[in-house]
Amino acid sequence: MPPRLDNRRLRELARARFTNPGGRRGFLVAFEGADGSGKTTQRKLFKTWLKAEGFDVVTTKWNSSDLVKPIIKSRKAVQALGPEEFSLLHAADFRHRVEHVIMPALWDGKVVIADRFLFTGLARDVARGLDLDWVLQLYQPLLWPDLVFYFAVSADTSGRRVTATRTPNFYEAGRDVTDLDDPVESYHRFVTRVIREYESLAVIFNFITIDAEQSMSQQHYQLRELFREGGKRPWSEWNVDAVVEWLALTRQRA
Amino acid sequence: MARAHPTTRVKVRRGTLISVDGIEAAEIVAAARARLAEVPRQRRAGVSLWDASGVFDDLVVAGRDAGAPSARTLLLLYAADLAFRLRWEIRPALAEGRVVAAAPYVATALAFGRAAGLPAGWLKQLFRFAPRPAQACYVDGSSARSGFIRFACGQLSLANGFLAQDVVARARKHLKPSARSRR
């Protein structure tokens, strides 16, 4: 086992890695927005463009860890999740991906594109009636993206796009909290709450808002421009605790 | 009249939660059952056990390729399981005015978290949703063959090179103050 490093030394290591002027540092971009906002389409276009520009890109999606996703999936199937369990299981899935996917890629200098980030948990859980402060605690130590693109749509547009091809499922429609049997009606009510929470988070956490009612190409070229500007941002010191905790874990695992 | 000896009998009230925490599952379950046995039969609701939701059973199925969970991930899952127990077992029993024992409850998780080096403040916030028990008991058992802490150490040791016995020893030290602070 490698020698144990104290917290101060781990902080120095983290800063040296992410502020090294000679190399391309890891960069984290989050795509956020209500269902039907078109963010997944934009995320794919953005990834293709980044790769063409020579970036090494890793994508991570919401609720996708090999460890926790099957647990969530089986419980969603039988509609067995209460708001707290829903929130805690998604936070566990997120934490596992931070430790096994996101941090290793950032450490290696890659661009990580997150199709939904912790803000999805915050918006949905608060829309389910949970306390924002408690939900935020679940995601500690916080890892802040370098850029958060928030795809803003109205509840009507979101509902129209989602229901055009399918019926929203039980949790997507928020039927666990709306007590409405009609999935479309429930979806509209729930997504209205989710969007309201997103709008608050956008102000608090300084998201870059993209008008998702624009054409696909307009949005894509806007993202390129925003990345060219934002890509030069210095590393956020706020992230040092998250990096240090991961480094400590990694050294234990080595 | 002879003075009554200090009793260990459970004081029965409407809806009473008793927490029993410790390292060894068999011992805390036995202690919880002993406590409940002192309660009139019609008021007993039973013992709420760790992993009633089956989250940790399912975790084992995921296998090693999924990556070893950290202590933080395991505690988020413990909290999810506890939320399930509260929703389906503990709160309904309390609402019916019964006596229910939770074995283990919050103190076991706090002790493991502290032993694994997690901040006390985060742990306290994480379990903020769990009601305080009317009585908090701690079982100072000698073995650590089964239960959450044993399981968690086993999961961590898959990849982390953790020495399970060190975590168990540290958890034991943390357990008593944690249990007391929840009273």
Language-model-derived ranges and their functions:
Chain B
Residues 17, 99, 136:
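Hydrophobic "anchor" residues on beta-strands that sit immediately upstream
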Residues 1-12, 18, 27-39, 142-183:
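NTP-dependent small-molecule kinase module
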Residues 102-105, 123-124, 129-146:
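Conserved phosphate-donor/acceptor-positioning beta-strand/loop module used by diverse small-molecule
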